[in-house]
């Protein structure tokens, strides 16, 4: 795990993604300048933490790159009412898997 991010930060980010997506599905409209843009900046910080993580036999460069791009894509998509629930769930599970992998790996 990156020295700049904690387990709490990863879990909080995952929860916030779900919360924002649920609100968007319920018709909430987010203001770009005051709500979406700060969250996108935060998501880029989380992606940077992933970029700082060490590689291993499972967490390869290709996986790292995909996790980082999925984080930023999902951070934007979570604010769109018409974004597919199935796709949101798959992407959320994907980054969750790698967050938990890195947390467990680096806590040993």
Predicted segments, located by residue:
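Short terminal alpha-helical segments
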Residues: 1-34, 92, 96-99
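Short acidic, glycine/proline-enriched loop segments that cap or flank alpha-helices
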Residues: 27, 31, 55-59, 82-83
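Amphipathic alpha-helical binding modules
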Residues: 69-108
């Amino acid at each position: 795990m990156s020295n700049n991010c904690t387990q709490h930060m990863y879990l909080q980010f995952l929860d916030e993604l779900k919360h924002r997506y649920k609100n968007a599905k319920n018709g909430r409209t987010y203001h770009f300048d005051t709500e979406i843009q700060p969250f996108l900046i935060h998501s880029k910080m989380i992606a940077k933490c992933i970029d700082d993580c060490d590689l291993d036999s499972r967490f390869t460069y290709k996986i790292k790159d995909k996790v980082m791009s999925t984080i930023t894509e999902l951070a934007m998509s979570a604010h769109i009412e018409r974004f597919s629930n199935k796709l949101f769930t798959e992407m959320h599970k994907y980054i969750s898997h790698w967050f938990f992998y890195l947390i467990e790996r680096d806590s040993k």
